Amino acid sequence: DGYICNNGMDKEERKMCGLLLLPLRSVSPSAYLAAVNAASERAPMIYPRAVSEGQFYSPPESLAGSEEDLDEEGLGRRAVSPQEKALVRQGKEAMAVVEQILAQEENWKFEKNNDVGDSVYTLEIPFHGKTFILKAFMQCPAELVYQEVILQPEKMAQWNKTVSGCQILQRVDDNTLVSYDIASGAAGGVVSARDFVNVRRVERKRDCYVSAGMATDHDGKPPHSRYVRGENGPGGFVVLKSSSNPSVCTFIWVLNTDLKGRLPRYLIHQSLAATMFEFMAHLRQRIRDLRSTR
């Protein structure tokens, strides 16, 4: 277990992934992300559930797959500048790490659950530390959760009290955007509100929807004295379709965050798990509200 990728693969599989000669003690964070990204491209079979061939997500006003630059009608948005290409690369790196986390579910450590059956797990990630993973079963189609949580992040503050605001700073291409997010205070006010700037990559696959992201810098939102600027490691939202029942789905939230400030680690961990459960309560209420108005 001194290697980056050792989740049940034999020697040849690890060699194929390009990870055999990368012990954790000798690689940098950038090398780790590059290796994970390369593994996801060269060996998709190690992600049996998270990765499948399918159509990519595209925003309502654009068409995925176009090679043209953004025109007056908003079709075919793609990264052009070096900064935009760097953002796309960051998004792909975050997506690769999230897919690795999903592929290692047998290594998730159970932490706690609530009275409706939602469970929080943790997993130690190289260079990013403890990652929290919430897994919940939902009595609604995957498309509904995708619409509310992944497709419309800027509207989440309307129903999710754990978030004070979300603003789309830039749509980089049909799969990548940069968002500015404000997280509400937690732990009874002991943890004050934090703000984040994240790059997000969204993909729509045959059996799931995925939004993966991580912290980035953007000229549109430099750090402000009003908030402590937090920093997210690779994480995101996953909505898994049911192969047998289209009216239910599984929701997974992967959270790796550094809230900064001088907070005791135990308090941070307690507040993160509580926030994840609270988010699920708000999400279920949102789904009920939507169904009652249809």
From Swiss-Prot:
It is found in: Late endosome membrane. A motif (FFAT) lies at residues 55-61. Phosphorylated. Phosphorylation allows the tethering of two membranes that participates in the formation of ER-endosome contacts. Phosphorylation of FFAT motif drives membrane tethering between the endoplasmic reticulum and late endosomes that in turn allows the efficient transport of sterol mediated by the START domain. Gene3D superfamilies: 3.30.530.20. Disulfide bonds: none annotated. Residues 79-292 form the START domain. Keywords: Endosome, Lipid transport, Lipid-binding, Membrane, Phosphoprotein, Transmembrane, Transport. Residues 58-77 are annotated as: Disordered. GO terms for molecular function: cholesterol binding; cholesterol transfer activity; protein homodimerization activity. InterPro entries: MENTAL (IPR019498), StAR-like (IPR000799), STARD3 (IPR051869), STARD3_MLN64_C (IPR029867), START-like_dom_sf (IPR023393), START_lipid-bd_dom (IPR002913). Transmembrane segments: none annotated. One of its GO terms (biological process) is vesicle tethering to endoplasmic reticulum. It is a multi-pass membrane protein. GO terms for cellular component: endoplasmic reticulum membrane; endoplasmic reticulum-endosome membrane contact site; late endosome membrane; lysosomal membrane; organelle membrane contact site. Residues 1-66 form the MENTAL domain. It catalyses: cholesterol(in) = cholesterol(out). Homodimer. PANTHER family: STAR-RELATED LIPID TRANSFER PROTEIN 3, STEROIDOGENIC ACUTE REGULATORY PROTEIN-LIKE. The START domain mediates lipid-transfer between membranes. It contains a hydrophobic cavity able to accommodate one lipid molecule, thereby serving as a 'hydrophobic bridge' across the aqueous gap between donor and acceptor organelle membranes. The MENTAL domain anchors the protein in endosome membranes and exposes the START domain in the cytosol. Belongs to the STARD3 family. Sterol-binding protein that mediates cholesterol transport from the endoplasmic reticulum to endosomes. The sterol transport mechanism is triggered by phosphorylation of FFAT motif that leads to membrane tethering between the endoplasmic reticulum and late endosomes. Acts as a lipid transfer protein that redirects sterol to the endosome at the expense of the cell membrane and favors membrane formation inside endosomes. This is StAR-related lipid transfer protein 3. The lineage of its organism: Eukaryota, Metazoa, Chordata, Craniata, Vertebrata. The gene is stard3.
